[in-house]
Curated annotation (Swiss-Prot):
HAMAP family: CbiX
Species this chain originates from: Methanococcus aeolicus (strain ATCC BAA-1280 / DSM 17508 / OCM 812 / Nankai-3)
Job description of the protein: Catalyzes the insertion of Co(2+) into sirohydrochlorin as part of the anaerobic pathway to cobalamin biosynthesis. Involved in the biosynthesis of the unique nickel-containing tetrapyrrole coenzyme F430, the prosthetic group of methyl-coenzyme M reductase (MCR), which plays a key role in methanogenesis and anaerobic methane oxidation. Catalyzes the insertion of Ni(2+) into sirohydrochlorin to yield Ni-sirohydrochlorin.
EC number: 4.99.1.3, 4.99.1.11
Location of the active site: H9
Pathway per the UniProt entry: Cofactor biosynthesis; adenosylcobalamin biosynthesis; cob(II)yrinate a,c-diamide from sirohydrochlorin (anaerobic route): step 1/10
The protein's name: Sirohydrochlorin cobaltochelatase
UniProt binding sites for Ni(2+): H9, H75
Annotated substrate binding sites: E45, L70, A71, H72, G73, N74, H75
Binding site for Co(2+): H9, H75
Alphabetical keyword list: Cobalamin biosynthesis, Cobalt, Lyase, Metal-binding, Methanogenesis, Nickel
Length: 143
């Protein structure tokens, strides 16, 4: 069984989760993946660990994770891989970031136990894809 998990940033406002949820619904309708779920980086539930644990419990053997972010950043390069257990958690001292200390609540307390035989595949964010360019041009025209 294959699961697709879309990761959103999350927000104190409802829009981030709503958009990721709508994208997930549209993907579900295509019937490509057995399971399609969303997980939120911060502020909202389901958290990333909640979602991953849920799809594992539902029998997913291959979990494809796509961050619904435009660009790589600290979240996609460090925080999410740490939550997924793909890289070690390090004490992050933001050297060279001008004392930029922001302590997010990243649900680090929750653990993901990945059983034997379950594969987690973590993909890149959207990037400057031509389809993103088309959307920007549509928005510029007021469409």
């Amino acid at each position: 069984m294959e699961a697709l998990v879309l990761l959103g940033h999350g927000s104190r406002l409802p829009y981030s989760k709503e958009i990721v949820g709508k994208v997930a619904e549209k993907i579900k309708e295509k019937n490509i993946y057995d399971i399609v779920e969303i997980g939120m980086m911060e502020f909202n539930e389901p958290t990333i660990p909640q979602t991953i644990n849920k799809v594992i419990a539902e029998g997913a053997k291959k979990i494809i994770i796509v961050p619904v972010f435009l660009a790589h950043g600290n979240h996609t390069k460090r925080d999410i891989p740490q939550i997924l257990g793909l890289i070690e958690c390090e004490e992050h001292h933001h050297e060279g970031e001008g004392g930029h200390h922001h302590h997010h609540h990243h649900h680090h307390g929750e653990k993901i136990e990945v059983p034997e035989g379950v594969e987690i595949i973590y993909r890149d964010p959207m990037g400057a894809d031509d389809r993103v360019v088309d959307i920007v041009l549509d928005r510029a025209k007021g469409n």
